[in-house]
A protein has these predicted regions:
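N-terminal active-site beta-alpha-beta segment that forms phosphate/nucleotide-binding
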Residues: 1-123
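Conserved phosphate- and dinucleotide-binding cores of soluble alpha/beta proteins
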Residues: 86-175
Length: 175
């Protein structure tokens, strides 16, 4: 199937879910992700802030933020800067504001990435970093169809896609 057709179909299927279906599916994704040992053991969490009909990540972010008092962990969320995307560390959802596109983005300047953060010099990114990726569709070969802007692809190419764990989250019909 052509990517543009696939994107349109996945958006349609997500829009057609009832609020109750979405809630049940989001809760299951939350449970599956937060109990995954490869997820729980990380120190840096790069995670998108859900928008519209995307798989909900706000509850995941709240959960991670609640762990900061108990564990040495860091949460970073993306912000689009022109044609690029960067991640900024947050300590609260209150640090987010709506962009021109209506997407919640960090309203601070604590830029982090897997190559520049001094903290990473003491860490092995493969052991300590996870990125939660959005997507409209995923395949069994770990391929991902995003929204077509290439922001995540460019970011991963710039900073080394093989350096850390990446987890795509979606509803079952998106695979």
């Amino acid at each position: 199937m052509e990517k543009s057709v696939l994107r349109k179909e996945m958006k349609r299927l997500r829009r057609e879910m009832t609020a109750e279906e979405r809630k049940i599916r989001d809760e299951k994704i939350f449970e599956n992700l937060t109990t995954l040992s490869r997820f729980k053991d990380k120190k840096w969490f790069y995670i998108y802030v859900s928008y519209g009909t995307e798989t909900d990540t706000k509850e995941i972010i709240k959960y991670l933020l609640s762990l900061k008092d108990k564990k040495d962990i860091h949460i970073a969320v993306p912000k689009v800067l022109g044609t690029e995307m960067e991640f900024f560390e947050i300590d609260s959802l209150d640090e987010l504001k709506k962009s021109n596109m209506g997407i919640l983005e960090p309203n601070n300047h604590r830029l982090v990435n897997v190559k520049d953060v001094e903290y990473f010099e003491r860490l092995n990114p493969a052991e300590n970093v996870v990125m939660i990726l959005p997507g409209l569709a995923f395949d069994i070969e770990r391929g991902r169809a995003g929204y077509g802007g290439g922001f995540y692809d460019k970011y991963l190419n710039r900073y080394g896609a093989d350096d850390f764990l990446k987890i795509g989250i979606c509803y079952d019909f998106q695979m």
